[in-house]
Amino acid sequence: MAKIGKKHQEALKLVDRSKSYEIKEAVELAKKAAKANFDETVEAAFRLGVDPKKADQQIRGAFVLPHGTGKTQRVLVFAKGEKAKEAEAAGADYVGEGDYINKINQGWFEFDVIVATPDMMAEVGKLGRVLGPKGLMPNPKTGTVTFEVEKAVNDIKAGKVEYRVDKSANIHVPIGKISFDDQKLVDNFVALTEQLVKVKPQSSKGIYMKNASITSTMGPGIKVDVSNFR
């Protein structure tokens, strides 16, 4: 059994594990409990009342957080002609066609998100075995397969996050850095929660927003009261 460090033990003492906190208080606690010597990422986790085995309850999408995530995303765009120029003008880090497909096949992954125009997907699709396991495959549901490359790049650079329910009906999404102002983390959490409520499947029965929590990279999980969103 792994030994719990002294700093982590101190952080655990700050949190009542049986209590669900208002989001503002939860953020304050997360900051007090953050003991690492780097700018920890704050992540929100949700347990939803859906059955991921049912096709119409496999929640997946993307959303631009009001205050971004605090992380600069490196964007690779597969496009040609005018769309390639559009991507470059929008600030994409890498733009190309077959040359980048070859680089990826050789183990190059110096990017965080891929955007592809639909006419490039026949070629990009060949990278499925490489990109799929890493969660990097472009997808229309997340706005990364599109001819609107300028908007796609701008959204990603502005702090767009992807969300996807796992097989246990959980969703995990970064909502910022521990260095963010409290209100920015609160705003991001509330906006994300409202977005998840918007995409609630019609076939979902009972309580939809079962529970939620936030945690920093090295900190304890802190339950958040989401009863107002159910």
Curated annotation (Swiss-Prot):
Signal peptide start-end: none
UniProt-listed NCBIfam families: rplA_bact (TIGR01169)
Entries under Gene3D superfamilies matching the protein: 3.30.190.20, 3.40.50.790
InterPro entries, alphabetized: Ribosom_uL1_bac-type, Ribosomal_uL1, Ribosomal_uL1-like, Ribosomal_uL1/biogenesis, Ribosomal_uL1_3-a/b-sand, Ribosomal_uL1_CS
SUPFAM superfamilies: Ribosomal protein L1
GO cellular component, one term: large ribosomal subunit
Keyword terms of this UniProt record: Repressor, Ribonucleoprotein, Ribosomal protein, RNA-binding, rRNA-binding, Translation regulation, tRNA-binding
Oligomeric form and interacting partners: Part of the 50S ribosomal subunit.
Protein name stated in the entry: Large ribosomal subunit protein uL1
Role noted for this protein: Binds directly to 23S rRNA. The L1 stalk is quite mobile in the ribosome, and is involved in E site tRNA release. Protein L1 is also a translational repressor protein, it controls the translation of the L11 operon by binding to its mRNA.
GO MF entries: rRNA binding; structural constituent of ribosome; tRNA binding
GO biological process: regulation of translation; translation
Family label: Belongs to the universal ribosomal protein uL1 family.
Domain of life: Bacteria
